Amino acid sequence: MNYLVSFADSRMYKSLIRLSKQAHTFKFFDKIFLLNEYNLSNSFKKKFKNNLILGSKGYGYWCWKPEIIMNIMNEINNGDCLLYVDAGCHLNIHGKKRLLEYFDLIKKQNKGIIAFQAVEPNKKNSKLKYDGRKLRNLKNYKWIKGDTLDYFKVRDNDTVTNAQEIAGGVFLIKKCEQSIKIIKEWQKIIYTKFDLISDTPSVSANLSGFIENRHDQSIWTL
């Protein structure tokens, strides 16, 4: 089974309506989950009541993202696949062929996650063709605060700090043991180390060239 998942607080309901219309044109998804704050559990809303504020950045720095994904994964079967997209994304029907390629890829791989970086496809393990478009420079040292680098013990790992961030707004997941483990770890960090996704200043020094924290995406990347 193939699913689409997105979330927006009630101020952005028009984005979810638009996304729903676009998704239905694909005639591909077995079920479409378009969620808002009313779909969050009472316990989650109580835990993050000081952050889940309408109009705030990412409705609480996107802390709800692994929460809703884990909730959906608890509903679906092993081997089922989902596409998560931020509500601001558009589903382009002219890209349906590529989307089907992604779903075909994830069904065949063991780790259960396909995520995206601003780099050309690796010809050694991908048949996807690069169309030549200019790619953004989103190196980790610019967008991940020092405290987060220290938490993951990668401050001195140039391979990591000079890599491109992994997009937190679009990814595919196949329900399997490995993907569940990753989402639960993402979820746990938000529950226990909320400062890593917030805009609070880093206690430890940021790396030279740091611009600003990329919130949930920084955790997802590392």
Give the location of each predicted region.
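Glycosyltransferase catalytic domains, chiefly GT-A lineage
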Residues: 1-222
